[in-house]
Structure formats: C-alpha cells, structure tokens
Curated annotation (Swiss-Prot):
RNAP is composed of a core of 2 alpha, a beta and a beta' subunits. The core is associated with a delta subunit and one of several sigma factors. This is Probable DNA-directed RNA polymerase subunit delta. Residues 106-177 have a biased composition (Acidic residues). Participates in both the initiation and recycling phases of transcription. In the presence of the delta subunit, RNAP displays an increased specificity of transcription, a decreased affinity for nucleic acids, and an increased efficiency of RNA synthesis because of enhanced recycling. PROSITE patterns: HTH_HARE. Residues 14-81 form the HTH HARE-type domain. Residues 93-177 are annotated as: Disordered. GO terms for molecular function: DNA-directed RNA polymerase activity. The gene is rpoE.
Length: 177
C-alpha cells in the first residue's frame, strides 16, 4: 500500500494496525517493534507524545490481531509468511485435569444464613420484652425446686448402699463354691 496517494486526513483515519500490516507487507521481512512504531509515527505524522499515549494499546492490538506473529526478540512479522509447521512458538504442555474425588454426604444440611434471626435490628417491638420478663418469672419459680433435687440425691445414696450390700453377698457365695 502506498501512503503517498492518501491525503493527510485519510491517513489520520487509518488505524495503526492497518499501517503496520501494509508496512510489513511492503518490507516482506520481520521487523522489531521499535522500528514498526517509528515507521507508524512517520507515516501518520504523530508526535512522540502521541506515540507514547497510544503505544500500549497498539501493542495489545498487535498481540490480539491474528494476522501478526511475534517471532521472539521483539520481532514481528505477518502470520501468512509462515506455514503452520514452521512456526516455532513456545508450546507449553497442558496439565491434565485432576480427577474429582467423590464427596461423601454427611447427612447434614448446609447452614443457611437466611434462617438466622437478625438480633442487631431494633424494631421497637415491646412483645419480645414481655416474653423475656415471663421467662425470668419462670426461672425464679424453678429455683425453688431445689428441694426435689435433694430428695433425688438421697435416693441415689440409698441405691448405692444397697448395691454394695449385694456385691458383698455375691462374693461370699462365690467363695463357698
């Protein structure tokens, strides 16, 4: 492509990728990235500041566009120049996916946070306060039931004494045999 036939307005509308494609096509040899950038700046009439502002996006576009290939050492060429068998790109072996282990079901449901009451919210509900007071009264009434517990303790002591007597009689019977 001859850029002399285009007007300056038409050249400004050309993308950097289109210019690189035609430059590489005219040269018919791989070129370093820095040389490509210099030629683009010359053809499009870009200042160094404009080039610096666009260089990152240009490099990204160059990598993404399937028409170009990086030959190493920052040299770029057209992919159409190289048959697939000749391309000496670094090919990394793909790791084999690991086999998934069968997870045993534990029988428990997963904890769902939605069911949990939000105790941090204050809604001004007085009914809850009444429930707490009722529970306090019930607990006070249960405190007086300690007498029943004492009776149970005495029953356990009596049972333990009977058990000891039984063990002694068993031992005597075994000795007689």
């Amino acid at each position: 492509m001859d850029f002399k036939q285009y007007s300056p307005e038409e050249l400004k509308e050309c993308s950097m990728i289109e210019v690189v494609h035609s430059v590489l096509g005219d040269k018919k040899q791989a070129t370093t990235f820095n040389e490509l950038v210099q030629e683009i700046a010359q053809v499009l009439g870009l200042s160094q500041e404009q080039v610096n502002a666009k260089i990152a996006q240009f490099y990204t576009d160059l990598n993404i566009d399937g028409r170009f290939i990086n030959l190493g050492e920052n040299r770029w060429g057209l992919r159409s120049w190289y048959p697939y068998e000749q391309i000496d790109e670094e090919i990394l072996p793909q790791p084999k996916p690991k086999k998934k282990r069968k997870v045993e079901e534990d029988g428990f449901d997963d904890y769902i946070d939605e069911d949990e009451d939000d105790f941090d919210d204050v809604d001004g509900n007085e009914d809850e306060d009444d429930d707490v007071e009722d529970l306090d009264k019930v607990l006070e009434d249960e405190d007086g039931d300690d007498d029943d517990l004492d009776d149970l303790d005495e029953d356990e002591d009596d049972f333990a004494e009977e058990e000891l007597e039984y063990d002694e009689t068993e031992e005597e019977e075994e000795e007689e045999l």
